[in-house]
């Protein structure tokens, strides 16, 4: 089966918004063992849409079309598909009734413009959208099925998961025997990881892929077929052994997610004091429901005065060692933990750049501490200074990993291949 994707919208074509739908769809299909072979982005011009539908339908077996199903004048996907096939738009009575019911349930009067969303190509098969007003549909043109989906990410994900994936499995008799293991890493570049893994002799049906999403690189281990699935745990275990401390989570999208679930299930509490990370550690945890059960407070103590007055850092420590130092960050962590007697506290202080560095402490120098009931662990690391965002996100990741290792009763401070360290 040859799968392609057509993304629509002037704002997508012009780069005014990042096409996260395309990235999500490609990643999701990969996890189902299907690779997208081509992706095309086209603006909201009727003639361009007609042309791309006609041209790509000669080459693909299935095309997922995303966007252009709304009620406004620049939503042209249904009209373009009808013209590409040489047929009329007709009202889908079932979807019109669904639209009217939706507005009634929400105590709203339905604008006449929304009736456009019930107009489908004459030969179209309606595809349900249980979470929105845009009607999905599929049409056969030339050799391809074109499957039309809304641009709203939440609606797209429902439709792909509940409608598209079952459709292609049935239509093309796809082998559903596909399994995936994800390993999340930090502290090593993609090329360094590949150098370690490419020499491995993998069993038949096992393949490895990489996805860079700084500060993490995700390793995806695919198993296709019953025999490959049976040996997947053994292969994943061997890869973890080869990569060592670089692997920080399994089947989690971020290290913050790993920490969230470990704390959620442990009954332990956490406080955070952040300087250079500016609330990033706290914010990433708050993204997950239930974080209030363990996260007691998150403080952004950016100025020296706030470090002294809020966290109780000794002014002489700042005078003698500076804000970016082991001594200061240890006092920050201790102070943050003591405020509410948390089980743990993380603290960061560093130079994120692009300015502020010195010969002794260049941009990318970050001090991180973890305070526990039994003592304090700390280190001062040297991070790549490619960007301010990278320094901050890597700092948060290393802080999370220190806490993760403490929760597992492992060595809290370890070496990472691409991260230097000034002091333990």
Curated annotation (Swiss-Prot):
Top-rank taxon, per record: Bacteria
Family that this chain belongs to: Belongs to the CinA family.
SUPFAM superfamilies, sorted: CinA-like, Molybdenum cofactor biosynthesis proteins
PANTHER family the UniProt entry points to: NICOTINAMIDE-NUCLEOTIDE AMIDOHYDROLASE PNCC, NMN AMIDOHYDROLASE-LIKE PROTEIN YFAY
Coiled coil: none
Cited Pfam families: CinA (PF02464), MoCF_biosynth (PF00994)
Record Gene3D superfamilies: 3.30.70.2860, CinA-like (3.90.950.20), MoaB/Mog-like domain (3.40.980.10)
UniProt protein name: CinA-like protein
CDD domains with a match to the protein in the record: cinA
């Amino acid at each position: 089966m040859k799968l392609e994707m057509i993304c629509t919208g002037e704002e997508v074509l012009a780069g005014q918004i990042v096409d996260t739908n395309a990235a999500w769809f490609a990643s999701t299909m990969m996890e189902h063992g299907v690779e997208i072979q081509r992706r095309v982005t086209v603006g909201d011009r009727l003639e361009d849409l007609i042309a791309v539908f006609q041209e790509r339908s000669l080459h693909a077996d299935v095309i997922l079309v995303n966007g252009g199903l709304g009620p406004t004048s620049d939503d042209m996907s249904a009209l373009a598909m009808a013209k590409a096939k040489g047929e009329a738009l007709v009202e889908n009575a079932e979807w019109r009734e669904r639209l009217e019911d939706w507005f009634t349930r929400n105590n709203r009067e339905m604008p006449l413009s929304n009736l456009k969303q019930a107009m489908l190509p004459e030969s179209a098969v309606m595809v349900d959208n249980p979470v929105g007003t845009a009607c999905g549909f599929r049409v056969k043109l030339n050799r391809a099925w074109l499957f039309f989906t809304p641009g709203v990410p939440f609606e797209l994900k429902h439709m792909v998961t509940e409608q598209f994936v079952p459709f292609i499995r049935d239509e093309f008799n796809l082998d559903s025997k596909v399994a995936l293991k994800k390993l999340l890493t930090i502290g090593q570049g993609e090329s360094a990881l590949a150098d370690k893994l490419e020499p491995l002799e993998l069993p038949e049906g096992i393949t490895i892929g990489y996805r860079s999403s700084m500060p993490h690189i995700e390793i995806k281990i695919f198993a296709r077929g019953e025999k490959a699935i049976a040996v997947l745990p053994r292969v994943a275990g061997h890869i973890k052994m080869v990569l060592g401390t670089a692997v920080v989570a399994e089947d989690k999208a971020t290290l913050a997610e790993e920490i969230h679930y470990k704390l959620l299930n442990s009954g332990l509490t956490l406080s955070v004091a952040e300087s250079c990370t500016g609330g990033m550690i706290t914010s990433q945890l708050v993204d997950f429901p239930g974080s209030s059960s363990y996260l007691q407070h998150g403080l952004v103590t950016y100025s020296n005065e706030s470090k002294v007055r809020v966290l109780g850092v000794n002014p002489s420590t700042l005078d003698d060692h500076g804000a970016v130092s082991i001594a200061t960050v240890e006092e920050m962590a201790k102070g943050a933990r003591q405020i509410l007697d948390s089980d743990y506290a993380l603290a960061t202080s560093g130079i994120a750049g692009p300015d502020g560095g010195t010969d002794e402490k260049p941009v990318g120098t970050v001090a991180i501490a973890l305070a526990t009931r039994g003592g304090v662990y700390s280190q001062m690391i040297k991070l790549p200074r490619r960007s301010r965002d990278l320094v901050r996100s890597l700092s948060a990741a290393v802080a999370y990993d220190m806490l993760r290792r403490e929760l597992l009763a492992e060595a809290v401070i370890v070496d990472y291949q691409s991260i230097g360290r000034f002091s333990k």
